[in-house]
Each structure stands twice: as C-alpha cells, then as structure tokens.
C-alpha cells in the first residue's frame, strides 16, 4: 500500500483472559478480516505484554481510511460486542485505545 500511514495504539485485555484473547483472534471471522482490508487497513499486528495485559497494535492505513465508517459498520460492532467481556471498553463496547506517537522509524 503506497503512502500508507503507520498507526500504533494500546488497548488492555482483562486479567486472566490473555489466552482467550489469543484464541478469539486465531478464530477471527473471515468477513471481518475482509472488512478491515476493504476499509484500508493492512499489515496489522497486535502484541501482548503478558505482565500487564497491555495490547500494542500496529497497522498501516490507506490515505483514504475513514475510522468513523468502519466504527459504524454492523460487523465491526458485532466483533466489539464479541470481545467486550474480555477487554477494557467504552460504553459502546469499542475497545478503549490510547494512540501512540511515532518517535522512530527505520525502513
């Protein structure tokens, strides 16, 4: 993806649910991965700090990526509901996220 924007953020899995978080992502719905790709997300990884439960997400976004459009999609909301019992979430069940500032990059 040319002119991709790197995006990094943190989330938090509830204590004791780290394995379940991994299982659910191992079984991610194919239609959700298609939606993420079609929305302009690629090269997406999530890492877990096992001591703190902090999740570190990093992804590349197309220049035309529209977060509000993805956030309002019924399938995205269904996934959030599916994950809400094991993550720290906002009132709409979206995961609580903390955007990170890039301070170094090497191609």
Curated annotation (Swiss-Prot):
Main subcellular location: cytoplasm
Active site per the UniProt annotation: 25
Binding site for substrate: 21, 44, 79-80
Recorded GO CC terms: cytoplasm
Keywords, comma-separated and alphabetical: Carbohydrate metabolism, Cytoplasm, Isomerase, Rhamnose metabolism
Compositional bias annotation for Polar residues: 90-100
The protein's enzyme class: isomerase
Annotated InterPro entries: Dimeric_a/b-barrel, L-rhamnose_mutarotase, Rham/fucose_mutarotase
Record bears the keyword Membrane: no
Recorded metabolic or biological pathway in which this protein acts: Carbohydrate metabolism; L-rhamnose metabolism
HAMAP family: L_rham_rotase
Function according to Swiss-Prot or TrEMBL: Involved in the anomeric conversion of L-rhamnose.
Family membership noted in the UniProt record: Belongs to the rhamnose mutarotase family.
Name of protein: L-rhamnose mutarotase
Protein's organism: Flavobacterium johnsoniae (strain ATCC 17061 / DSM 2064 / JCM 8514 / BCRC 14874 / CCUG 350202 / NBRC 14942 / NCIMB 11054 / UW101) (Cytophaga johnsonae)
Gene name for this UniProt entry: rhaM
């Amino acid at each position: 993806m040319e002119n991709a924007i790197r995006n990094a953020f943190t989330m938090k899995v509830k204590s004791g649910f780290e394995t379940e978080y991994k299982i659910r992502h191992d079984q991610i719905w194919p239609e959700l991965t298609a939606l993420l790709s079609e929305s302009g997300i690629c090269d997406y990884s999530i890492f877990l700090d096992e001591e703190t439960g902090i999740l570190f997400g990093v992804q590349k976004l197309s220049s035309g990526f529209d977060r509000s459009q993805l956030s309002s999609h019924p399938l995205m909301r269904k996934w959030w509901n599916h994950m809400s019992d094991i993550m720290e979430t906002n009132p709409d069940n979206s995961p609580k996220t903390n955007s990170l500032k890039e301070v170094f990059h090497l191609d």
